[in-house]
């Protein structure tokens, strides 16, 4: 499967949800100490932690610029709190949220390094690391010369999956067989063919249609 391929390129195993949450809390508590912020206890962090993992996973899955996104989220929260009286109960609550959002980028960095040290990852991080490592693996001939990959049955890819496939295609080490129904592909009004129509415009992928 493509998940196994991503794991082989990234060198990271798949972390279990509870394990990832526990490691995320360690990164959170450590980041709080560095930033002189009082950390929430684990039981109050747990739900936030689940949402954070989901957000980090989406960012990495799409190879989105994590620093830009997370710092923008903090800035948006800061602007939204301008009108509040920070001495009021609502203001104090909002101030706590703002402190948390200001931690997101350093927390993401610490968590990433912690997971790499532990040789595990969530799906999105494994994909991002695989994309970062693949060019070097190819340059160093770490992938046997006779190895060839055939990707079949896809009609939508994450940003990381797309980048991996494009890199392998450019090196003539892969082909792709799309799960493409002409009815959905040729009709711009058919939402089911949205991603396939995008791939058809991609110079690395269009000759497989």
Please place each PLM-identified region on the residue numbering.
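Nucleic acid-machinery interaction/catalytic patches
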Residues: 1-209
